[in-house]
């Protein structure tokens, strides 16, 4: 509460009043807070307080009040609410009044008596500021809170590894006032001079960048006496540093002052104030009203509304804050005019009335306003000061607000960073006994300050023609990606890769691509691959912000297809800080790309106390990229392979930690090993037992060891034209080179298949490759029942090709049914050993049959979605098996089902996350249902009913019988593409890299190829030519390497 002080320009007794706690008046060492002149003729009606014969009265509310008579002279009075009133000596008239100001204003009457009274309506209360004869109190020193209100991030928010979520910054943050650290537009050199003049490590300031208008820089003096500059991106009212989002620069300062380090072990400590106050925000005023278009980021406004401009976007659009409503959004520049620096900075605030008289302010409050309404206008008594007008039940009171030299505002002896802070304070605290500030009286007759001759018709027509498609300048790439949120949630968001400023910006949707949901400054990031094992889904990658000393914070993304994910990764890598140090080479230079293959084999003698279900986490440097499955026991065997391709150039080691699988959201790392890549001989596999170290005390227990096979390779890629002769030899229609490589590359079959497929796809010869290899496989097979059962180069190529081209078909055929299974709580369990007590197997069977009917129907209807080239290859398979086994009438059906169902549809049903059909793991009921559905669909595709092996599944047999004929028709129809279709799609592959990789395979197996060339008659000439070209390419590569070294 605050005692209202009477104010007049006439003489009379003086009263000092202050709201808040700990104020003191009347001491020569601590001057009075304020003085109030009271009219000599003021009527007083209350019990008199004898002895107040002199003019000095000081009142403080809450806390201790101290008054020394030396300053005010005889008759000084200290009044304190809720505290002690103490008077210094010097006169017998000194009195301590503990009740001063309880019922209203403490007022001294003309007779020298003191009265407690509520002021009449005719009286206006206004405190006097610095002009009243006493200097203002200096502002209290800024004291950062000791741990209070800083907030913590819940460990449970990151279930799958280190993760940064922009929501995590929404915690209470405190920072010094803006005027203590904001310097406006300032160049780098002057900023460094100001910090060095301050002379304290931990000193900082924020400035607007002189190189990038609209963005800011945090300049910081480190303990090493080095000034570091950190880029801050301002975007639509938010501020981003690295990838962290803050709603204000003050929040950013608070975060790096109290929550996180800016450099290792260093926080923001000492703000450096500018030499003089800075107010450089661009302001504009509406010259016409506007109503927003629904479902956009536009804002509606009135004529006369004032705006702060945050961002100037393309095509005349601006992102602003409406000072009247505090609403942020889009406006177009045609509807506004510039506001000059000479206009009051509070113009546009809903409570500010800069162009009305004192009498008009009274009239507004009494006619338009209600009790507890208020407004602020410039003071008539003291230019530069302000008056807060406030309506009570009986009168209108006013309080003087005085700006201070250090950009604060004083009212009633308290100091605030802004007038808005004063208003917020007295919305919560009583300004007068029993009263709080409530609604401001809005600005009336706004038209009077504007040019009424503006013709809006043409302006509105111009706005309708404007589009919002060009808010961002240099859009290198755009589209949808999945982004991982808190826990295990993934959300489909719209992304823009902005090339001019190296920013990845994301939005809720393409329709609302104005104010970002988030922004990542790629100049301080690196892109890392994410293995499928980490989240149980494919096509993932991560952006790691690495600029600051704090633990890396990470953004995870997933593409719908491998090609989409790879395309985004390559696009992002071109703008990442670490990639800029090694730009793409020209056609006459050698490119180098590194990769790492890890085989986590087994562990030995893990501590029994700590491990029952151990698994491994794999890190590149300190960034997690993969994990193994959990295995039981102290000597677990994993035998899992992990391939990390195109490593960022800063990767210099891999780390493997061992954790124990529990039901906790995140299992701690217990043991670890670390290996520098420089230890590995490039291109050669190593097989080694690594002794493990411990993150926790093991108390004399040996930590055990881990067997890892690793191969680190550095690909040297020459310009594409250097491989032209090599490519011609590979693409010969007889495929002699392909056959030879399949013979010698048994261990590298998957790698060989992926390289060959990309090369032939690039040349639009994938049908030649697949049909020829399939025909060869069929011709070499004697038993129809074992055709394509073994894993060969042909079957591996077919599987890879289907996954690469048939994703749309899989989603169309399966997604709806699988989503229903995920949502359903109804079991389909038929096995007696797995049924719950009192569970009705007939209900479960009915539910399973309903799912199967719907799913199979969708599959049958999706045949036209399969790519025509794939269907042509199926047709070639059917013709080949008919020619090989003319009397086997089911073979043409089963050869296609073996690929479509066994290697595509059923794997997608069993593991829908791996096909990006779902993002979350299925519940135990849903997982079991998926297994039963896959079993049933596979048997239908094989045209086989369930029998004695799984008798509990016999209830599905009627469904299989009734759909056999339709299945045969469906599979036959898939192959009904007799001619190879023309395709306009061009596969986006790095052909020179694939050719270089194939060349490295030839080099690695050159001895086997040489032996083979001496054995095979028809292929002998081709293989000897292959060996000669391989040797020639090796020599050219050495020449390029020498040239690069010279440069």
UniProtKB/Swiss-Prot annotation:
BP GO terms, sorted: blood vessel morphogenesis; ephrin receptor signaling pathway; intracellular signal transduction; mitotic cytokinesis; negative regulation of apoptotic process; negative regulation of cell adhesion; negative regulation of cell-matrix adhesion; negative regulation of neuron apoptotic process
Site (described: Arginine finger): 789
Domain of life: Eukaryota
Protein's UniProt keywords contain Transcription regulation: no
Post-translational modification: The N-terminus is blocked.
Protein keywords: Acetylation, Cytoplasm, Disease variant, GTPase activation, Phosphoprotein, Repeat, SH2 domain, SH3 domain, Tumor suppressor
Domain Ras-GAP: 764-974
GO cellular component terms, A-Z: cytoplasm; cytosol; plasma membrane; ruffle
Entries under Pfam families matching the protein: C2, PH, RasGAP, SH2, SH3_1
Chain positions with Phosphoserine modification: 831
Keyword Acetylation carried by entry: yes
Outcome (variant: residue 528 to C): In CMAVM1; uncertain significance
SMART domains noted in UniProt: C2 (SM00239), PH (SM00233), RasGAP (SM00323), SH2 (SM00252), SH3 (SM00326)
Modified residues (N-acetylmethionine): 1
CDD domains, sorted: C2_Ras_p21A1, PH_RASA1, RasGAP_p120GAP, SH2_Cterm_RasGAP, SH2_Nterm_RasGAP, SH3_RasGAP
Quaternary structure, from the entry: Interacts with SQSTM1. Interacts with SPSB1; the interaction does not promote degradation. Interacts with CAV2 (tyrosine phosphorylated form). Directly interacts with NCK1. Interacts with PDGFRB (tyrosine phosphorylated). Interacts (via SH2 domain) with the 'Tyr-9' phosphorylated form of PDPK1. Interacts with tyrosine-phosphorylated EPHB4.
Annotated function: Inhibitory regulator of the Ras-cyclic AMP pathway. Stimulates the GTPase of normal but not oncogenic Ras p21; this stimulation may be further increased in the presence of NCK1.
Disease as annotated in the protein's UniProt record: Mutations in the SH2 domain of RASA seem to be oncogenic and cause basal cell carcinomas. Capillary malformation-arteriovenous malformation 1: A disorder characterized by atypical capillary malformations that are multiple, small, round to oval in shape and pinkish red in color. These capillary malformations are associated with either arteriovenous malformation, arteriovenous fistula, or Parkes Weber syndrome. CMAVM1 inheritance is autosomal dominant.
Stated name of the protein: Ras GTPase-activating protein 1
Lineage start: Eukaryota, Metazoa, Chordata, Craniata, Vertebrata
Gene: RASA1
